Amino acid sequence: SDVCSSDLFRLFKKTWPGIVQLAEDLGVKIGIENCPMLFTNDEWPGGKNLATTPAIWDRMFDMIPSKALGLNYDPSHLVWQMMDPIKPIYDYKDRLVHIHLKDVKVYKDKLDRNGILATPLAYHSPKLPGLGDVNWNNFFTAITDIRYRGPLCIEVEDKAFEGSDADIRSAILTSRNYINQFLPY
């Protein structure tokens, strides 16, 4: 069935208006990450998060039009879903609350073997910025075009940089050094 007409929207409509109203009252913005939270077979087919695609975001924002509700945007999640990760930056510029700087590598040979309906980790791997398939030049052009001045957070989930404090420091420095070429400030 169409995820846009699922029981999740009834639950969203029941649960979120009060939370968003409280955020408005406190002058706080809520950013829901666009990660499907789909990692294992028990989460298939839809994952554990509603806010995963532009069609769903439109429905959410129609249901709760408050500007206190927005997105914690991570381009990598659209890449592995075979979607354009740049266009939503322009389309949802007024809803971007927080941005994750995380890349992803889609392994075509694994995708060809497992298919798009496999759990996503069967064919992709989270990567540091610059080590995957996100076009960071286009990404930073877009966030510069829309004059985004909110938080940018390096999200390290690259398995090649796990195991020790030195690996973690290396991941952060490698990411920072790559990203610095795009920052206008």
Identify the residue ranges that each predicted region occupies:
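Histidine-acidic metal/acid-base catalytic patches
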Residues: 4, 17-21, 25, 29, ...
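Flexible, glycine-rich active-site loops centered on histidine and acidic residues
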Residues: 1, 6-8
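Short, structured patches in soluble enzyme cores that scaffold and shape functional sites
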Residues: 30-36
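Mobile beta-alpha loop/short-helix "lid" or hinge segments that flank ligand
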Residues: 1, 36-38
